[in-house]
Structures are given as structure tokens and as C-alpha cells.
């Protein structure tokens, strides 16, 4: 039997549902999610393998007009995938009109010479007439290989989209073992799960100012628990106070919620210790960006 494989990038503006889609396809959490824009900062692979095929999805940071060095890193990480994939899924929301951000991405896609499938997400939020108008508007902007409306949250049409990708795969190698679901190490996934809880529980400027560093992660032979020490980095003392909360209540809540997700992922009991440190303006310092896991050399 012929084995087929290929690489598929998921591109789009922030908050259009790229990570929700990837997690639904994979059947488990690979990429963190929140209602905050620019939640995804790194490229994250989701490796979907059957006995006949392997589709390597690359979830990318939302493309936006960058205002910091971190923003530059995120946008470059997204666009760099155009050089390394066989197909692009360009995801747009059904419930928002086409904007300047979409037009900017479309111009880059036209120049990339890669087959592009338009994925219109969040169809559960709109009337069919609005959906048809949205599809017609985007259809006039460029020549898409396919146009597929979906609801990543509810799963509508997601399997159909995967089938379309499968039909267009070419004969190729199995790049990853069948039990590997992502390219990122466990430490990265743990740091992202902690950051997700910070995003979920805080507001205003804090989400964009947070990075999480895993200081150590090892099994304690006496308790048979995975002992994790993590530092939450922020840019200002006021942000540190908010994350710690009154009497440490917010930090305790972040740790408790993150620990449950980490235990599900690792399949082990976890002892999680968290600290909060201030590193002023880290998002604009390239050395700090690399220390916190945002290194262009890896992309």
C-alpha cells in the first residue's frame, strides 16, 4: 500500500480559531487557546498519522502588524512556513468582514506559489446568507484551490477538510513515528499550559507581557510525582502583583488549573511550583526573547 504525506500550514489573523482547529483534528490539546489575540507565539506542529498517511499541520502565530520585537518574531515565524509546506490553510472568521489584515496575508499568499485552501471558520455564528456573502467576497480576492466552511469549535466539516487534504497528498515518507503528535518537547508544552491559564485568568495588558520559563522538570522517586519549577516572567511590578493576587490567591489558582492539564498530558501526578519575576521590557530585548524560547534560529 502506498504511503502519503505532506506538510500543511495554518495561517490567518489572530483569534480566528487556528489552534482550536488543530486541537480538534488531533483529538487533544496541542496548542493553547484563549480569547486573547496572539495567544500562539511559536510555530507548533500537530502530527496526524493513520496507516495510510501522515499530515504534519503547522499552527502559526496570528499575523498582525507587529509593535515589538516579539511581534516581529511571531509574524516572521508565521510567514516562514510558506517556504516549507505543500499546502496552506488560510483561515478566516465567518462572523467578521474581510479586513486589511486579510488582504495583507492574501498578497503574501499570491506571491508564495503554494496551493491555498480557504477555511471559513465559525460558521455556527452566522446565518447561511452571511456565510455565502463572505465566501463570495474572498473568492474574488484570489484563486483558492478549495473553499471549506467549518466550525472548529463544534467540529462541523472538520473531517471533510482533513479528507480533502488527504486526497491531495502525494506519495512520501513517514517523517515521524506514529505515536508522536507534536515536535515540541514536554517542557515547552508545560510552559504553554501555564501561560494559557495566565491568559485565561488575567485581563488588559498582562497577557501580552507574560512568558513562562520551566526552570526544572524531573521525577521525584520518593513521591513518584513529576516535580516542576516554573517562573512566570512579566514586564512590570504592577503586573507581578496582579498575577500573585491577594495573599497569593491568583498564583495559586493559575498553578492549580495548569497542574490538572499537565497531569492529563503527562499521565502522571505533578507537583508544580511557580514564581513570578519582573524582567522590564523583555518583549523588545532579543537576548531575553531567546532565553524565553522565542529564537529565530529555530525557524
UniProtKB/Swiss-Prot annotation:
The UniProt entry, under SUPFAM superfamilies, shows:
P-loop containing nucleoside triphosphate hydrolases, Prokaryotic type KH domain (KH-domain type II)
Q: How does it assemble?
A: Monomer.
Using the UniProt annotation, give all residue ranges assigned to the region (G4). 121-124
Query: Where is this protein primarily located?
Result: cytoplasm
Biological function? An essential GTPase that binds both GDP and GTP, with rapid nucleotide exchange. Plays a role in 16S rRNA processing and 30S ribosomal subunit biogenesis and possibly also in cell cycle regulation and energy metabolism.
Which residue range or ranges hold the KH type-2 domain? 202-280
Q: Which gene encodes it?
A: era
- GO molecular function terms listed in the Swiss-Prot or TrEMBL record: GTP binding; GTPase activity; ribosomal small subunit binding; small ribosomal subunit rRNA binding
Q: Which residues of the sequence carry a binding annotation for GTP?
A: 12-19, 59-63, 121-124
Taxonomy of origin reads: Bacteria, Bacillati, Bacillota, Bacilli, Lactobacillales
GO cellular component assignments: cytosol; plasma membrane
Query: Residue ranges of region G1?
Result: 12-19
Which species is this UniProt entry from?
Answer: Streptococcus gordonii (strain Challis / ATCC 35105 / BCRC 15272 / CH1 / DL1 / V288)
**Where is the Era-type G domain positioned along the sequence?**
4-171
Provide the residue span(s) of the region labelled G2: 38-42
Where is this gene product found? Answer: Cytoplasm; Cell membrane
Family classification: Belongs to the TRAFAC class TrmE-Era-EngA-EngB-Septin-like GTPase superfamily. Era GTPase family.
Q: Where is this region: G3?
A: 59-62
* Keywords on record: Cell membrane, Cytoplasm, GTP-binding, Membrane, Nucleotide-binding, Ribosome biogenesis, RNA-binding, rRNA-binding
* Region named G5: 150-152
Q: How does it sit in the membrane?
A: Peripheral membrane protein
Which named protein is this?
GTPase Era
InterPro entries in the cross-refs: G_ERA_dom, GTP-bd, GTPase_Era-like, KH_dom-like_a/b, KH_dom_type_2, KH_sf_prok-type, P-loop_NTPase, Small_GTP-bd
BP GO terms, sorted: ribosomal small subunit assembly
Amino acid at each position: 500500500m502506498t504511503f502519503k504525506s505532506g506538510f500543511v500550514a495554518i495561517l490567518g489573523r489572530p483569534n480566528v480559531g487556528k489552534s482550536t482547529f488543530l486541537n480538534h483534528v488531533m483529538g487533544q490539546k496541542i496548542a493553547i487557546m484563549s480569547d486573547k489575540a496572539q495567544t500562539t507565539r511559536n510555530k507548533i506542529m500537530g502530527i496526524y498519522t493513520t496507516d495510510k498517511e501522515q499530515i504534519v499541520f503547522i499552527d502559526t502565530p496570528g499575523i498582525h502588524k507587529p509593535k515589538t520585537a516579539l511581534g516581529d518574531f511571531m509574524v516572521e515565524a508565521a510567514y516562514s512556513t510558506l517556504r516549507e509546506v505543500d499546502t496552506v490553510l488560510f483561515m478566516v472568521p465567518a462572523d467578521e468582514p474581510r479586513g486589511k489584515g486579510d488582504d495583507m496575508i492574501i498578497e503574501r499568499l499570491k506571491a508564495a506559489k503554494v496551493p491555498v485552501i480557504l477555511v471559513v471558520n465559525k460558521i455556527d455564528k452566522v446565518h447561511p446568507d452571511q456565510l455565502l456573502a463572505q465566501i463570495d467576497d474572498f473568492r474574488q480576492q484570489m484563486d483558492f484551490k478549495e473553499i471549506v466552511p467549518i466550525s472548529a469549535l463544534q467540529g462541523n466539516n472538520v473531517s471533510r477538510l482533513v479528507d480533502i487534504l488527504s486526497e491531495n497528498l502525494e506519495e512520501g515518507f513517514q517523517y515521524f513515528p506514529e505515536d508522536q503528535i507534536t515536535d515540541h518537547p514536554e517542557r515547552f508544552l508545560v510552559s504553554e499550559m501555564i501561560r494559557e491559564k495566565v491568559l485565561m485568568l488575567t485581563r488588559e495588558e498582562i497577557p501580552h507581557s507574560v512568558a513562562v520559563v520551566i526552570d526544572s522538570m524531573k521525577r521525584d522517586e520518593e513521591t513518584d510525582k513529576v516535580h516542576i519549577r516554573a517562573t512566570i516572567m512579566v514586564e512590570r511590578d504592577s503586573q507581578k502583583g496582579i498575577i500573585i493576587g491577594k495573599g497569593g490567591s491568583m498564583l495559586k489558582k493559575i498553578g492549580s488549573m495548569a497542574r490538572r492539564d499537565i497531569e492529563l498530558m503527562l499521565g502522571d501526578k505533578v507537583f508544580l511550583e511557580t514564581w513570578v519575576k519582573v524582567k522590564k521590557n523583555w518583549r523588545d530585548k532579543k537576548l531575553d526573547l531567546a532565553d524565553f524560547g522565542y529564537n529565530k534560529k529555530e525557524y
